[in-house]
């Protein structure tokens, strides 16, 4: 049996919203594997993990910059939210986004080596900011969408100032028709993505491992049923999964679209555009997703400081 610690139980509880004893049992049953424990709880019908499993915490800012038919998102992490509210840090993050869009760069190492407006290279500007502010900072990722003809939709949720916030969204709609007719829809879809958090444009874009994991959960949840019945249940469950996770299959959250999917709304817009409209790409950056936030023992820190060890 794995050594299940209180910290592990706490982490699983935060991910799933499940009671402490159920979390402890799940960890014991899965050898202390957090992700396996999430699935174990889902299979037992004890978890809200489908909605909460992706919740993580990290500090910093997402920056959004749009220039014509190009848009960029960047994420820069800091150790504390206090630094994220620092004007010098905000200035740096905004300039990183500007460099990315002007030079068409998304590779982190290439960005660090790019020319910085104030002189030198961007990597040096980050190092200087670390020295000045006194806290470590990391340029984590960047994404760029360019549509030669069409529209860029963007949205920043939990904005701390213009173009900076906690959740940033970019979406690109390509059309040879009237781009102005498409622009309002691009904005609507960006807001939809922020709220609905799709994983891919359609089923073909989903990670095969994610699909297989969902199949396994559905199969085990319905274990014992005849094979032909189980096959239909899994097939039906996957269709529901695609409606939840694939952008074109999701129902628009705008009342005026009357229950239509995003794919159907795009088709409707083609009449006004006078040409086909294609959703070519989207990005949704939530600050800190996929990062494990280090937790410190405050009492131990105080004791260490008092004894001169800190």
From Swiss-Prot:
Matches recorded under InterPro entries: EF-Ts_dimer_sf, Transl_elong_EFTs/EF1B, Transl_elong_EFTs/EF1B_dimer, Transl_elong_Ts_CS, UBA-like_sf
Family matches, as SUPFAM superfamilies: Elongation factor Ts (EF-Ts), dimerisation domain, UBA-like
PANTHER family named among the record's database cross-references: ELONGATION FACTOR TS, ELONGATION FACTOR TS, MITOCHONDRIAL
Signal peptide: none
Protein biosynthesis recorded as keyword: yes
Annotated compartments: Cytoplasm
Protein family per UniProt: Belongs to the EF-Ts family.
Pfam families in the record: EF_TS (PF00889)
Described function: Associates with the EF-Tu.GDP complex and induces the exchange of GDP to GTP. It remains bound to the aminoacyl-tRNA.EF-Tu.GTP complex up to the GTP hydrolysis stage on the ribosome.
Gene Ontology molecular function: any one: translation elongation factor activity
Species this chain originates from: Beijerinckia indica subsp. indica (strain ATCC 9039 / DSM 1715 / NCIMB 8712)
Cellular-component GO terms for this entry: cytoplasm
Key words, A-Z: Cytoplasm, Elongation factor, Protein biosynthesis
Involved in Mg(2+) ion dislocation from EF-Tu: annotated segments: 80-83
Keyword Cytoplasm assigned: yes
Gene: tsf
Identification of the protein by name: Elongation factor Ts
Highest taxon in the source lineage: Bacteria
Organism placement in taxonomy: Bacteria, Pseudomonadati, Pseudomonadota, Alphaproteobacteria, Hyphomicrobiales
């Amino acid at each position: 049996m794995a050594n299940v610690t209180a910290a592990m139980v706490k982490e699983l509880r935060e991910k799933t919203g499940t009671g402490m004893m159920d979390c402890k049992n799940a960890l014991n049953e899965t050898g202390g594997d957090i992700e396996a424990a999430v699935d174990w709880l889902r299979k037992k019908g004890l978890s809200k993990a489908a909605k909460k499993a992706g919740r993580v915490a990290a500090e910093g800012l997402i920056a959004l910059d749009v220039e014509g038919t190009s848009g960029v998102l960047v994420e820069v992490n800091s150790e504390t939210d206090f630094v994220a509210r620092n004007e010098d840090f905000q200035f740096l993050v905004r300039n990183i986004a500007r460099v990315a869009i002007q030079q068409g760069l998304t590779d982190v190492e290439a960005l660090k080596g790019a020319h910085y407006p104030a002189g030198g290279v961007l990597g040096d500007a980050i190092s200087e900011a670390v020295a000045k502010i006194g806290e470590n900072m990391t340029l984590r990722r960047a994404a760029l969408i360019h549509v030669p003809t069409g529209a860029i939709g963007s949205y920043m949720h939990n904005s701390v100032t213009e173009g900076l916030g906690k959740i940033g969204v970019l979406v690109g709609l390509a059309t040879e028709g009237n781009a102005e007719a498409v622009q309002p829809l691009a904005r609507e879809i960006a807001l939809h993505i922020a709220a609905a958090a799709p994983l891919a444009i359609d089923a073909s874009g989903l990670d095969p491992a994610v699909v297989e994991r969902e199949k396994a959960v559905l199969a085990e949840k319905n274990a014992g049923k005849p094979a032909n019945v189980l096959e239909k249940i899994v097939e039906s469950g996957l269709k529901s999964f695609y409606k939840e996770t694939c952008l074109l299959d999701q129902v628009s959250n705008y009342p005026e679209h009357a229950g239509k999917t995003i794919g159907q709304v795009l088709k409707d817009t083609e009449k006004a555009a006078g040409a086909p409209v294609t959703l070519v790409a989207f990005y949704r950056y939530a600050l800190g997703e996929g990062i494990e936030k280090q937790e410190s023992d405050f009492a131990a820190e105080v004791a260490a400081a008092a004894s001169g060890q800190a």
